[in-house]
């Protein structure tokens, strides 16, 4: 069951590595829990691969004991997807931000 915690403001890879260190899991062990290769996880942590799909983020979050929303990029992706369905809100926000 995922722990309750504050949202991370760090980049995806930094957050994954921090959580791995916190629970004492290696790339190989996390790979076994998620079905992802240790090499791929290493690339994610070091920023050599883009942030994965929401489904992969959800899998990683569960294995690391957090909610998917813990990851900044997951929150941003969710916001973007919802905003795309509301073009009038995009325009209002844009004007309000003075952009």
Regions found by a protein language model. Give the residues of each.
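A short, Lys/Arg-rich alpha-helix, primarily the initiator
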Residues: 1-25
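Residues within the helices of the helix-turn-helix
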Residues: 17, 28, 58
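The alpha-helix within a helix-turn-helix
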Residues: 20, 31, 61
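Key DNA-contact positions within bacterial/archaeal DNA-binding proteins
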Residues: 28, 39, 69
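Recognition helix of helix-turn-helix/homeodomain-like DNA-binding domains
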Residues: 35-51, 74-77
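DNA major-groove recognition helix of helix-turn-helix/homeodomain DNA-binding modules
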Residues: 55-70
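Short, charged recognition helix plus adjacent turn
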Residues: 72-99
């Amino acid at each position: 069951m995922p722990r309750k915690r504050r949202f991370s403001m760090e980049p995806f890879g930094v957050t994954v590595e921090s959580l791995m260190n916190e629970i004492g899991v290696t790339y190989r062990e996390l790979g076994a829990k998620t079905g992802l290769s240790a090499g791929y996880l290493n690339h994610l942590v070091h920023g050599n691969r883009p942030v994965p799909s929401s489904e992969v983020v959800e899998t990683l979050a569960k294995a690391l004991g957090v909610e998917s929303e813990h990851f900044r990029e997951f929150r941003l992706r969710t916001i973007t997807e919802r905003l795309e369905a509301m073009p009038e809100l995009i325009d209002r926000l844009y004007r309000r931000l003075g952009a």
